[in-house]
Amino acid sequence: MASRFPRFSQGLSQDPTTRRIWFGIATAHDFESHDNITEERLYQKIFASHFGQLAIIFLWTSGNLFHVAWQGNFEAWIQDPLHVRPIAHAIWDPHFGQPAIEAFTRGGASGPVNIAYPGVYQWWYTIGLRTNQDLYTGALSLLILSAIFLIAGWLHLQPKWKPSVSWFKNAESRLNHHLSGLFGVSSLAWTGHLVHVAIPESRGEHVRWDNLLTALPHPQGLGPFFAGQWSVYAQNADSSSHLFGTSQGAGTAILTFLGGFHPQTQSLWLTDIAHHHLAIAVVFIIAGHMYRTNFGIGHSMKEILEAHTPPGGRLGRGHKGLYDTINNSLHFQLGLALASLGVITSLVAQHMYSLPAYAFIAQDFTTQAALYTHHQYIAGFIMTGAFAHGAIFLIRDYNPEQNEGNVLARMLEHKEAIISHLSWASLFLGFHTLGLYVHNDVMLAFGTPEKQILIEPVSAQWIQSAHGKALYGFDVLLSSANSPAFNAGQSIWLPGWLDTINNNSNSLFLTIGPGDFLVHHAIALGLHTTTLILVKGALDARGSKLMPDKKEFGYSFPCDGPGRGGTCDISAWDAFYSAVFWMLNTIGWVTLYWHWKHITLWQGNVAQFNESSTYLMGWLRDYLWLNPSQLINGYNPFGMNSLSVWAWMFLFGHLVWAIGFMFLISWRGYWQELIETLAWAHERTPLANLVRWKDKPVALSIVQARLVGLAHFSVGYIFTYAAFLIASTSGKFG
């Protein structure tokens, strides 16, 4: 008999259809639970899937390059980056009537097109690409790379090429290679590209394969390098009147420390960026020689961890036992990787707008808003995933004997203190912040705005002043002309930095006031509550006073039946599920705040944010009600415009979001009754009753319905906000 889906679990494949399909999909990637899995096969499958993942990423980026080269307007955009709208790709839609064709034909195109808001035009322009031919070459190269990775993935599943478990668990070698090779050498290679291709291109010199070996990136070549006169490479930098992409005002320096932004492009100096990558390369290549491998020199990670016993014995046995615990748990390693990647992704969001690296991207407001929002949402999902896998580690991989008395065991031992402190912080933040907003709201409603409680964020303003922002008059560190710090940096990066930080037209160290103070604490409430739910879910995943044997039930279970009342809703999966709602709402506040503050900055009316953000009706009326006007105007009595697609997506996003509640609020019994009624009708309907089922149709389980509800809530939430963000920004700024 041909085995049915899922082939990896004979038990599941014999189950009734609903359970078989749902649990089959849910456990498809849970290799640990598959039939006949061994530790060796587990590691090899994950290793091979990494090659597939990389192949997909390169295929996707290749597609971006290819479609822009084929249907975009890259060469036209380069001539006037501030006024030509960059095209992502053409739209072919047989339903388009004449009004739609006219509305979507823009950016100098001959037919309907999509405008690009991911910043790839600015990125490609900055790194030295100039023609469609360059884009096609890049697309083809990435396609070939993608194929190589697919072949490598297949190859490493063949008996002769399968790595052993000991190879996967060789942490020191992996660290050395990832630090030196992945980060170090790739940063060095990127420095090379910037110095040999991007910087000459920004000065009007065209360097390609045909002249790469003959075009000197610096007039003195490698002479100063070997003579130890490295400062020569920083001399004669581009002037402040330099026109990007031309020789006008260009210098010859390749590695500088100018600080601040290029006046015309409003982005970091390319020569500063090259210097930064060279420094990263040096640091990481050295770091990749730290750990002991076959050569018997360097640090042993295990020895470092075992030796690290805290002074005074206040922290028990410190890190003893951690090396083997982490090295033998894929979930622990994944949790650490996701936590790091989540933080990095959020930092990318914060830095892409405040310190823009790509030429002219700072003046493309819709792209700035889209990139910030995109990276914050991605960060939220990745961070919640870190806690999910942390909980799975505690359930599946944690061994109490191995970790006796170490920092991990002590986390579990005093979990009540951790959870209650987080709870207290969340309650404090929530009540005080809401109290201030509501008080201010009532004062405005009663016509006495002067009775608002407005708190200046003095600590944050002091920190901004220490970095050189003069506006607040704090006269401290870099904002004080007498400080040693001020004098020390005067000859290198400081003048450029101070000009930039005190220039009110960019997003670096934005001026903050009482509205920022309030929303900052609202966001802090969201962050602490999300963390509380996730930390509690992980720390209670093995067991709690209510359910001491919880780990026997696994990561996700609905309840343990009526015999133990009150065991519903307490699996680690339920904590993850609850936390995602808080995560989404928190990032909602973050992105609303960012967007409103920037809209007023870009329009030159910062007073609107400053005055309206201190009370609830201000947020509702002057941001959430005022800005969707473009969305509800996508179709009007005069026909349609180019925002109509966002208007439709805005409505569709609300629909998907609302469908989520259908699954979240009505539970299993309702659906089971409904299904049985539908089945009854089906069996009595001519023609329809020719189609029969082998097993009884059943409703989704509680956990399955929650997953479907959560998926619709998340997707609808993001679709709605994406449409709102892009339409309200592009509608204002063209």
UniProtKB/Swiss-Prot annotation:
Binding site for chlorophyll a B3: 662, 670
UniProt-annotated location(s): Plastid, Chloroplast thylakoid membrane
Name of this chain's protein: Photosystem I P700 chlorophyll a apoprotein A2
A UniProt-annotated Pfam family: PsaA_PsaB
Transmembrane segments annotated in the record for this chain: 46-69, 135-158, 175-199, 273-291, 330-353, 369-395, 417-439, 517-535, 575-596, 643-665, 707-727
Positions that bind [4Fe-4S] cluster: 559, 568
MF terms in GO: 4 iron, 4 sulfur cluster binding; chlorophyll binding; electron transfer activity; magnesium ion binding; oxidoreductase activity
Membrane topology: Multi-pass membrane protein
GO CC, one annotated term: chloroplast thylakoid membrane
Annotated positions binding phylloquinone: 671
Gene3D superfamilies to which the protein is assigned, alphabetical: Photosystem I PsaA/PsaB
Keyword Amino-acid biosynthesis attached: no
SUPFAM superfamilies documented for this protein: Photosystem I subunits PsaA/PsaB (SSF81558)
Binding site for chlorophyll a B1: 654
Reaction(s) the record says it catalyses: reduced [plastocyanin] + hnu + oxidized [2Fe-2S]-[ferredoxin] = oxidized [plastocyanin] + reduced [2Fe-2S]-[ferredoxin]
Organism: Huperzia lucidula
Keywords attached to this entry: 4Fe-4S, Chlorophyll, Chloroplast, Chromophore, Electron transport, Iron, Iron-sulfur, Magnesium, Membrane, Metal-binding, Oxidoreductase, Photosynthesis, Photosystem I, Plastid, Thylakoid, Transmembrane, Transmembrane helix, Transport
Major localisation: plastid
Coiled-coil residues: none
Cofactor remark: P700 is a chlorophyll a/chlorophyll a' dimer, A0 is one or more chlorophyll a, A1 is one or both phylloquinones and FX is a shared 4Fe-4S iron-sulfur center.
